C-alpha cells in the first residue's frame, strides 16, 4: 500500500519554509508589503491570488511559497493540495494559520500509483508542520484509507482478483486481531448461490468467494459493512462493448471502500475514533466472466435463505446487472446477525453517474436521520454525497412472470433507484440500512485528487460512524 504516513508532523519549531496564503480580495494589500523584486517574481509566475495558484518568492538568502485560496481563514480539505503537488521536497509551515482539515489534501495530493512504471520518479515528499498535534493521527488514518482505495482500484484485474481482495482482508484481520472466514467452492454454491452464479465462469485463479471479517466486542452495537467485489465485469453473456469494459477493473471499488472503512473502524483507537462496535465486514468477491458455464439471460437462481429472507428467486434479465446479485446474498448474510446498521458500497449503476456525474456518490437510506447524518458528515469533510429516493411505486418494475423478482427491468427508468430497491428486498425489515452507489474513479484530476481510482463517500461514512459510535 502507498505509504505517506510521515507527511504531517508536529511543529516543534524546527526549520521550515514559510507558506503564505492569500485570496484575490486581499491580494493587492498583501502585494504592497513586498519588495519590488518579490512583486516582479510573482508577476513572472502570473500569480494573482486565485484558488490553486502557486508561486515561489525570493526572500533574502532563501524563499517562501505562496498559495491562492478562497478564504485563508476557512481552509477546505483541498486548498493546500496544489502546493503539495508542485513544491520542491522539503519541510513547510503555514505562516499565518494552522492548516486544519487542509492536512488531508496535503497528504492525498502526494499519492502516485507507479507500481507498473519501469522508470517511476522517486518520491519528493513535502512535509507540513502543524501545532494541532491531536489532529495528525486521525488525518493520517483517513488519508491512508483513501490511498488504500486508490491502490486497490488502480490495480489491474490480473493482479486484483478475488484472491487479492481476500489477501487484503487477511492483512486487515492480522493487523487488528479480527476473525476472518472465507467461503468458496461447493460451500459457496450452497450458501451464497447468487455469488456463485455470477462468479462461476471465471478462471480457477479468479474463483468466486465470500469474504467475512468480524471484530470487536460482541456486547457492542453490531454494524455490517458490505462491499461489491466484482474484480472485473465483462458484462457476462450480455457483454459490454470494449469502451464500456475498459475501466471495469474498478468494479470492485465498493469492496475497496468497505475494506478501507473497516480498517478505520478497527483502527479507530489509534486514530482518535475509538469506535465501540461489533463489526461484520462482507465482501462477495467475483469476476463476471464469459465461459460455457456462465449464467444466462432467463436463468433463475435463488438467493441465500435465512430466517429473515426465504431465498427469493431471481430471474436474470441482464447478466450485466450482476453487482446487485452478489450484494443480495451478502446483505441476507449480514442481517442474519441482527445488526442495528448496515452500510453497503457498490459501483452499481451507470444511471447514478448520469444523474450526478462522477464526483458525487448517490446515497440511499431507509431512515431520514441516517441520510442526514451521512450528508452532514460529508459536508464537514468535503466529501459530499447526494440522497436519491427509494420510491415504493417503482417496486413493481422488479416483478417477474417466472420468479419472485427480476434483476434488471427492461424499461431503463430510474436505474439507480431501482437497483437500490432490489437490494432493499434483501435487507431485513426494521434494519437501518444505507447504500452508496459510487463511481470509485476520477476521470479528470483535481488538486489532491489525481485521475484514477478514488474514494468517494468513504470519509462521509466514516464521519457518520464516528458521530454515532465514537
Regions found by a protein language model. Name each.
Residues 1-229:
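Short amphipathic alpha-helical segment within the helicase RecA-like ATPase core
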Residues 166-470:
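A generic structural signal for tightly packed, nonpolar segments enriched in small/aliphatic residues
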